[in-house]
């Protein structure tokens, strides 16, 4: 949503300072292309980071795969049972 407002704001600036309609169209087109390319770069960086994470050998990987939300409700009972010993 922020990018939409940024593009509209830049389009407004382009309209106020442009010499002709063609300049405005070219400016808007350039800004949209720039935003799309930046988004694609961010997504490719995210994909590269994920692939590195999967391919890295990490000894504590099993800890990350534990479903902590399912285990959290049982923690007080486990602590209570451990405290009775």
Curated annotation (Swiss-Prot):
GO cellular component terms, A-Z: extracellular region
Cleavable signal peptide: 1-18
Annotated compartments: Secreted; Target cell membrane
Main subcellular localisation: secreted
Keyword ATP-binding carried by entry: no
Expressed in which tissues: Expressed in entodermal epithelium along the body column.
Propiece residue ranges: 19-57
Residues found modified as Alanine amide: 82
Keyword list, A-Z: Amidation, Antibiotic, Antimicrobial, Immunity, Innate immunity, Membrane, Secreted, Signal, Target cell membrane, Target membrane
Similarity annotation: Belongs to the arminin family.
Role of this protein: Antimicrobial peptide with a broad-spectrum antimicrobial activity. Keeps its antibacterial activity under a wide range of salt concentrations that mimic physiological conditions of human blood, which is surprising, since Hydra is an obligate freshwater animal with nearly no salt tolerance. Does not affect red blood cells.
The protein's name in its UniProt record: Arminin 2c
The organism of origin for this protein: Hydra vulgaris (Hydra)
């Amino acid at each position: 949503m922020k990018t939409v407002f940024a593009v509209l704001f830049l389009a407004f600036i382009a309209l106020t300072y442009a010499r002709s309609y063609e300049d405005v169209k070219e400016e808007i087109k350039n800004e949209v292309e720039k935003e799309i390319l930046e988004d694609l770069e961010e997504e490719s960086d995210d994909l590269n980071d994920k692939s590195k994470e999967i391919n890295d050998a990490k000894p504590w990987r099993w800890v990350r795969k534990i479903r902590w939300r399912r285990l959290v409700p049982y923690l007080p009972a486990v602590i209570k049972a451990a405290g009775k010993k």
